Design a protein with these regions (language model features):
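ATP-dependent small-molecule kinase phosphotransfer cores
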Residues: 1-18
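Conserved phosphate-donor/acceptor-positioning beta-strand/loop module used by diverse small-molecule
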Residues: 32-55, 59-68
């Protein structure tokens, strides 16, 4: 399946290089890699809508519905392939609420974690 093909590529890349992998159940795929940092970033729907419209220039019509559907698909995919719960803090080394912290601060924190680990 596509999941297993992606998993093999993720493992291969991670075993050879320093990398950042967004999504793809990478925290689960790389759980046996000791030098991996697993992070979950989340925000409320209002912030997601604002970012989608401002940053990605998406049309604001139906964007809330689209974003909720995407999150639901992500959740189903993650839960199915990992047997874990998407967004459950126990599955990650750190979780950040980008509404509270701000996305640029989240990036700075992650960078500091990676450098000092």
């Amino acid at each position: 399946t596509m999941f297993f093909a992606q998993s093999n590529v993720i493992k291969e890349v991670a075993s050879k290089h320093s990398c950042v992998i967004v999504g793809r159940c990478a925290n689960h795929v790389l759980e046996k890699f000791d030098d991996c940092i697993n992070i979950f970033i989340y925000s409320n729907i209002e912030s997601k809508i604002k970012r989608a419209v401002e940053e990605y220039k998406l049309d604001s019509n139906n964007i809330e519905k689209i974003l909720k559907e995407r999150d639901k698909l992500r959740e189903k995919h993650y839960n199915y392939y990992t047997g874990k719960v998407w967004g459950d803090a126990r599955n990650y080394h750190a979780c950040f609420n980008s509404d509270f912290i701000g996305i640029n601060n989240v990036v700075d924190i992650i960078e500091k974690i990676a450098i000092n680990r």
